[in-house]
Curated annotation (Swiss-Prot):
Keywords: Ribonucleoprotein, Ribosomal protein. One of its GO terms (molecular function) is large ribosomal subunit rRNA binding. Pfam families: Ribosomal_L14 (PF00238). GO terms for biological process: translation. It comes from Aedes aegypti (Yellowfever mosquito). Belongs to the universal ribosomal protein uL14 family. SMART domains: Ribosomal_L14. PANTHER family: 50S/60S RIBOSOMAL PROTEIN L14/L23, LARGE RIBOSOMAL SUBUNIT PROTEIN UL14. Disulfide bonds: none annotated. GO terms for cellular component: cytosolic large ribosomal subunit. NCBIfam families: PRK08571.1. This is Large ribosomal subunit protein uL14.
Amino acid sequence: MSKRGRGGSAGGKFRISLGLPVGAVINCADNTGAKNLYVIAVHGIRGRLNRLPAAGVGDMFVATVKKGKPELRKKVMPAVVIRQRKPFRRRDGVFLYFEDNAGVIVNNKGEMKGSAITGPVAKECADLWPRIASNAGSIA
């Protein structure tokens, strides 16, 4: 029986190490007023019994704001991971990791709620999300 998946299509997402399981608290790197994001669920994870769903760079996840403006707190919203501490391998063989875990708040279409991103954005994320790439200060 064949495995389900993207089938390695051109322009598809390359498999990277997933460093942010459900329950992780990460920095919010945009100017929406949120300080950190709490990972509730990860989009597109089918899962396995007793395995926590986890997100990596470029993954969309469901989040809540734990610290930040009161109008953003206690609401469920989508977000995208732009940096992760866990090393992940690029196609050219280099292993890359960042000094923090960070994400940005988006809408369901992937358009950013804020208008600026602090710090670098991973190239893998910028390739998948053009609206995030356009607001990125630097792409690493």
